[in-house]
């Protein structure tokens, strides 16, 4: 009898432990799969594509790739002598038309004072028309001069903001055309994280909620705040035909892949971030407040570790 009771007790204890373990693992798995988190996240930053507004030979490159530069710092210079000559020519034209306009103004004023008693109305009108033509030419010459001055100023390409020069692909002696991208500038203190959350997890994501960011290959956890959630994504299942009619792709009702929606996360401390734009991270949205690790259960901690390494 005692042996039977002992066997039953062992069996009961084993069953209870298995059930408890199953419940714990199930809860950890639910927390792992349904709470708002994703491994599909990227560090991003504001990037300025720098292109010259004038064409010409590059005469000097003042920076090197991946250099940190300050706003207004010279990046490279384009053939200035040519644009200096163009400015001098435009200034000479302005000076010529200024003198000519003064002469025609005096002539028109003299004829207007003498009036029709000394000459015909046609001669007076002709003098006034010549003056207006010269004034128009003077205005055009001044505009050309201002444009030449602007072109000369823009032969010196400067950094529009503090940041890092990246993908520098210009060299002294090369010819560069107007509008062609020469270098990218990653703005300093503009880094953020784009987390691509599955639509099934968006219920736990709101602007202002706190987030944890773990870069791939690192145990360092950065803190951030949900800044915004994208208002829409492309509908890959619907297109338009050549007549404007909607074309809907067929799908299997029992197999539905969750869409991913971009969630922008603002980093608390820009100075702590050493990860370049485009690198991967894991993001966990913890809710209105930061997660208190001391209050986490063993299985919840295990779920967090699964997120990092899974």
Curated annotation (Swiss-Prot):
Superkingdom of origin: Bacteria
Provide the disulphide bond pattern.
Answer: none
Membrane topology according to the record: Single-pass membrane protein
The entry lists its GO molecular-function terms as: transmembrane transporter activity
Which Gene3D superfamilies does this one have?
A: 2.40.30.170, 2.40.50.100
Kindly state one GO CC term assigned in the UniProt record: plasma membrane
Q: Where are the transmembrane segments?
A: 12-32
Query: Is the Transmembrane keyword given for this protein?
Result: yes
**Which controlled-vocabulary keywords does the entry list?**
Cell inner membrane, Cell membrane, Membrane, Transmembrane, Transmembrane helix, Transport
* Cellular location(s): Cell inner membrane
Q: What induces it?
A: Positively coregulated with aaeB and aaeX by AaeR.
What start-end ranges are recorded for coiled-coil regions in this protein?
A: none
Pfam families the UniProt entry points to:
CusB_dom_1 (PF00529), HlyD_D23 (PF16576)
Function summary: Forms an efflux pump with AaeB.
**Which family would the database say this protein is a member of?**
Belongs to the membrane fusion protein (MFP) (TC 8.A.1) family.
Full protein name: p-hydroxybenzoic acid efflux pump subunit AaeA
Q: What is the lineage of its organism?
A: Bacteria, Pseudomonadati, Pseudomonadota, Gammaproteobacteria, Enterobacterales
């Amino acid at each position: 009898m005692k042996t039977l009771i002992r066997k039953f007790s062992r069996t009961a204890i084993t069953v209870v432990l298995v059930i408890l373990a199953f419940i714990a693992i199930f809860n950890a798995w639910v927390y792992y799969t349904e709470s708002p988190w994703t491994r599909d996240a990227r560090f991003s930053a504001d990037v300025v594509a720098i292109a010259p507004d004038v064409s010409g030979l590059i005469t000097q490159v003042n920076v090197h790739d991946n250099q940190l530069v300050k706003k207004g710092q010279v990046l490279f210079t384009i053939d200035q002598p040519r644009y200096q000559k163009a400015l001098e020519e435009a200034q000479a034209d302005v000076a010529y038309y200024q003198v000519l306009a003064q002469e025609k103004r005096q002539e028109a004023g003299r004829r207007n004072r003498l009036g029709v008693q000394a000459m015909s109305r046609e001669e007076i009108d002709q003098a006034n028309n010549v003056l207006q033509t010269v004034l128009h030419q003077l205005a055009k010459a001044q505009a050309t001069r201002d444009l030449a001055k602007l072109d000369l100023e823009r032969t010196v390409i400067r950094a529009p903001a503090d940041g890092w020069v990246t993908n520098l692909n210009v060299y002294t002696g090369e010819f560069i055309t107007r509008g062609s991208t020469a270098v990218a500038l990653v703005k300093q203190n503009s880094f953020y994280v784009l987390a691509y959350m599955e639509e099934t997890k968006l219920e736990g994501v709101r602007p202002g909620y706190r987030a944890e960011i773990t870069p791939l290959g690192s145990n360092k956890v950065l803190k951030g705040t949900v800044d915004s959630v994208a208002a829409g994504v492309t509908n890959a299942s619907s297109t338009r035909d050549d007549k404007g009619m909607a074309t809907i792709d067929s799908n299997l009702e029992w197999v539905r892949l969750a869409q991913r929606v971009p969630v922008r996360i603002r980093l608390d401390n820009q100075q702590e971030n050493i990860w370049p734009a485009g690198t991967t991270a894991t993001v966990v949205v913890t809710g209105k407040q930061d997660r208190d690790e001391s209050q986490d259960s063993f299985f919840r901690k295990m779920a967090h570790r699964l997120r990092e390494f899974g």
